[in-house]
Amino acid sequence: MKFIIKLFPEITIKSQSVRLRFIKILTGNIRNVLKHYDETLAVVRHWDNIEVRAKDENQRLAIRDALTRIPGIHHILEVEDVPFTDMHDIFEKALVQYRDQLEGKTFCVRVKRRGKHDFSSIDVERYVGGGLNQHIESARVKLTNPEVTVHLEVEDDRLLLIKGRYEGIGGFPIGTQEDVLSLISGGFDSGVSSYMLMRRGCRVHYCFFNLGGAAHEIGVRQVAHYLWNRFGSSHRVRFVAINFEPVVGEILEKIDDGQMGVILKRMMVRAASKVAERYGVQALVTGEALGQVSSQTLTNLRLIDNVSDTLILRPLISYDKEHIINLARQIGTEDFARTMPEYCGVISKSPTVKAAKSKIEAEEEKFDFSILDKVVEEANNVDIREIAQQTEQEVVEVETVNGFGPNDVILDIRSIDEQEDKPLKVEGIDVVSLPFYKLSTKFGDLDQNRTWLLWCERGVMSRLQALYLREQGFNNVKVYRP
């Protein structure tokens, strides 16, 4: 099988040296992602496209899906590459390929040509289109808004029969821009803002301020791992977790109620800036949107920015909540966000929308900054690829099994789409479907006299969810890894 990768248009207008660098980086990113599916595949870069050739036909759908999620790719063409002799040969091959698709449809033919030939692209379009129209009686030519467009590419003595076109996410290849540190809470905003910076070519590391215990951190780890695995797995990134409960406790005890929200955000920026400096990261990323909550007025945002020299990027600053939720739905983080607890909004009963710098600084004089230094020093830094291994260490009390007993039920916790694409069937045991994002609210409705064996393809989500359910008091869960 063969795929032709078309570059994001902004890449093609760069200078020659920059364009070549971007293409080289994108080629490396594609190799890094696809090697998990087929180690023998070939990735070949050209001036205006990248070719991917693979031998394992069983991985065709997985490879195609992975390509649509790599930043820097505008669209993917799945093609059949065959030799041809003349225009009539092109027509005959197109007839075999497209006859079934064109039955009873309106169609047009579009051709791109490279190389030296005694015919033009329009000549091929007319010849092939006329031939298809004659040989498929129920088909009809329609040059504007046809039901089917027959795409052909001619390159020297090769004909590319385009079997399908699939849109990519666009943007710049990860690694073409500098690293950033995303302040991730697991909600709608931070997930979308992280994705937007990945799509713009940044390697996104994650910094999480834990305000709600182990269960909260597990949920945010899931979001970060999902974003990385889906859009940024070509690069290694860090997940830094900071236990911010001591800082919140100090704020609740010593800071005036109205100033708590702004001061909490200032403390987070201070801590994140220290982490960014430690790892040589150039900017912080937040999901703040203008006027969304009390701390996100222009006055308050300016005061928050003032505590650090580190650049703070806010890609969602002009977005409304509906737009953000729609983006979260598109990238797949909506269900995570809906079940994620929100802690920041509850610590202040009457927050100020226009904080005064003098008052904020006066309140912060009451704060013991050694507490902030201590939590940053004790921050837990993990390679995001090791989340599964770390979870295995943390859930030693959760048994992993490769078999089952008479009272066991396998619980498939993959997303609905994954379950529909690849249903799980295991002989001799019942399999129940319950997506991971519904476990927190629906697991208690299941028969608690049964033992539930949580399963997902890679075992990451099942381990994270097993730990979460254990913390909620459910002792009838195990991890199933056949």
From Swiss-Prot:
Keywords: ATP-binding, Cytoplasm, Disulfide bond, Nucleotide-binding, Redox-active center, RNA-binding, Thiamine biosynthesis, Transferase, tRNA-binding
Keyword Cell wall biogenesis/degradation among record annotations: no
One biological process term in Gene Ontology: thiamine biosynthetic process
GO cellular component: cytosol
InterPro entries: Rhodanese-like_dom (IPR001763), Rhodanese-like_dom_sf (IPR036873), Rossmann-like_a/b/a_fold (IPR014729), ThiI_AANH (IPR020536), ThiI_fer (IPR054173), ThiI_N (IPR049961), THII_Thiazole_biosynth_dom (IPR026340), THUMP_dom (IPR004114)
Source domain of life: Bacteria
Catalytic residues (positions): 456
Annotated positions binding ATP: 183-184, 265, 287, 296
Enzyme class name: transferase
Residue ranges annotated for the THUMP domain, each copy included: 61-165
Annotated pathway: Cofactor biosynthesis; thiamine diphosphate biosynthesis
Disulfide-bond pairs as recorded: 344-456
Rhodanese domain mapped to chain residues: 404-482
GO molecular function, one term: ATP binding
HAMAP family for this protein: ThiI (MF_00021)
UniProt function note: Catalyzes the ATP-dependent transfer of a sulfur to tRNA to produce 4-thiouridine in position 8 of tRNAs, which functions as a near-UV photosensor. Also catalyzes the transfer of sulfur to the sulfur carrier protein ThiS, forming ThiS-thiocarboxylate. This is a step in the synthesis of thiazole, in the thiamine biosynthesis pathway. The sulfur is donated as persulfide by IscS.
Name of this protein: tRNA sulfurtransferase
